[in-house]
Amino acid sequence: MADPVEQFEIHKIFSLGHIGGQEIAFTNSSLYMLLAVGAVALLMLGGSAGRRLVPTRFQSMAELSYEFVVNMVRESLGEEGMKFFPLVFSIFMFVLMANLIGVIPYTFSVTSHLIVTVALALIVFLTVLLYGLYKNGLKFFRVFVPSGVPIYILPLIAMIEVISFLSRPVSHSVRLFANMLAGHITLKVFASFVTSLGALGVAGIAGAALPLAMTTAISILEVLVALLQAYVFAILTCIYLNDALHPGH
């Protein structure tokens, strides 16, 4: 049976040179991140070019994506939070496309790598922190002091809130990474069962029916997980950004 973790290995495609003794390389991970960005650009440019009263498929998909994120941001952050729409939309579409591309057989899932999800989570975390301090000054630290907390337990609650705030990039990134990693490993294991049993002949082919059915079911589930995890990552981004706009609420 093939190693189910082998699909996550990063391979160098070509070198970009050396900086400080360290090689900078263009890898398969870099390639699929560019493909995800390119797919988003193609969808949005294709959907906005030559708009029609009766929308084309590209136009319908682009408008649906746009309206979905607009409604998410408006409901979570209000009109004041619409300034963050470009950030939330970019993150949502990148994660969505990267997830969906990763579901295609023999491709590479960039969101199954923790370094990618941590980078996205840190962008959100630093945006919340820096904009919160810029907009609210020291009042931003009210986010660590929930209103209505009795004074005698306030130090304990404040400490818990600080730890919770600092751990956001961890939970935000690990949730996406773990879900995508687990799904791809499970799919690879069942697909390997099908291949191994099919190689045994007629009896093996009959025995491969159940793993094949499970592989098909998991593949469909993986598409749903790809959509759901992009939404979860985006809605958590909105929830965290709300603290920058309204600390202490």
Swiss-Prot record:
The chain crosses the membrane at residues 30-50, 84-104, 114-134, 143-163, 193-213, 220-240. Keywords: ATP synthesis, Cell inner membrane, Cell membrane, CF(0), Hydrogen ion transport, Ion transport, Membrane, Transmembrane, Transmembrane helix, Transport. InterPro entries: ATP_synth_F0_asu (IPR000568), ATP_synth_F0_asu_AS (IPR023011), ATP_synth_F0_asu_bact/mt (IPR045083), F0_ATP_A_sf (IPR035908). CDD domains: ATP-synt_Fo_a_6. The keyword Transmembrane applies. Disulfide bonds: none annotated. It is found in: Cell inner membrane. It comes from the Bacteria. One of its GO terms (molecular function) is proton-transporting ATP synthase activity, rotational mechanism. Its main location: membrane. It is a multi-pass membrane protein. GO terms for cellular component: plasma membrane; proton-transporting ATP synthase complex. NCBIfam families: ATP_synt_6_or_A, PRK05815.2-4. Belongs to the ATPase A chain family. F-type ATPases have 2 components, CF(1) - the catalytic core - and CF(0) - the membrane proton channel. CF(1) has five subunits: alpha(3), beta(3), gamma(1), delta(1), epsilon(1). CF(0) has three main subunits: a(1), b(2) and c(9-12). The alpha and beta chains form an alternating ring which encloses part of the gamma chain. CF(1) is attached to CF(0) by a central stalk formed by the gamma and epsilon chains, while a peripheral stalk is formed by the delta and b chains. Key component of the proton channel; it plays a direct role in the translocation of protons across the membrane. This is ATP synthase subunit a. The gene is atpB.
